[in-house]
């Protein structure tokens, strides 16, 4: 860039603090699988299912596995969906005995600014953040894309600061024998994540 217009454009870009793509960085970048063909480190992931499908239970076991196998250094689990009684019924004390498993009941009004504040943490490497469930942390209408884009921008910045983030989400109510695998809310929920998984409770009969 060598003329005045180019210099102005460069100044605008620099003031926006955008990061220029670096060829060497791209060539040296390797994907690190936390679980082969399922979970990549430093990604934003949605896991959604109907009520009673075992989303939270699944995340407790997954979290414990990742810590026990030294895939990550710590887990920060934010729960605004379940009660302490529910956690006890799920034998939560056995999961929480795992070192560096931090579990927080997040049921006050401060939860609505969690994502905005979380992005300020600059070093979240080797950290798994679990959001259970995301609808409980959103004060705005989560059916509207223009309100959800801001929420996901905040989550993406936390991911870019090193975190692996998994949030749990719900489905609309459906007939028991029918499931179209739809999730609640705006298309942003799937558009703005690295991966989205539908969790189905296997029939053991």
Task: Kindly label every feature range from the protein language model.
Residues 8, 81-83, 196-197:
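Intrinsically disordered, low-complexity regions of eukaryotic proteins
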Residues 61-70:
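Walker A/P-loop NTP-binding motif
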Residues 46-47, 52, 56-57, 61, ...:
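Phosphate-binding/switch region of NTP-binding enzymes
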Residues 1-13:
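Short, small/acidic-rich helices and loops at N termini and domain boundaries
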Residues 12-13, 26-30, 34-35, 40, ...:
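Conserved inter-motif catalytic segment of the P-loop NTP-binding fold
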Residues 18-23:
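OB-fold nucleic-acid-binding modules
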């Amino acid at each position: 860039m060598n003329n005045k217009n180019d210099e102005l454009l460069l100044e605008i870009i620099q003031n926006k603090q955008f990061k220029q793509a670096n060829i060497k960085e791209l060539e040296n970048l390797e994907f690190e699988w936390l679980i082969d063909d399922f979970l990549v480190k430093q990604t934003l992931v949605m896991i959604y299912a109907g009520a009673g499908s075992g989303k939270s239970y699944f995340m407790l076991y997954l979290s414990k596995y990742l810590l026990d196998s030294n895939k990550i250094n710590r887990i920060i689990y934010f729960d605004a969906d379940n009660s302490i009684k529910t956690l006890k019924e799920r034998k939560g004390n056995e999961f929480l005995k795992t070192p560096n498993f931090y579990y927080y009941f997040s049921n006050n009004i401060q939860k609505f600014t969690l994502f905005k504040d979380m992005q300020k943490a600059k070093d979240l490497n080797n950290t798994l953040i679990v959001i259970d469930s995301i609808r409980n942390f959103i004060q705005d209408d989560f059916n509207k894309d223009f309100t959800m884009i801001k929420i996901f921008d905040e989550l993406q910045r936390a991911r870019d600061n090193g975190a692996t983030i998994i949030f749990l989400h719900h489905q609309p109510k459906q007939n028991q024998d029918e499931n179209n695998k739809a999730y609640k809310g705006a298309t942003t929920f799937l558009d703005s994540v690295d991966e989205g998984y539908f969790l189905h409770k296997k029939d053991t009969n």
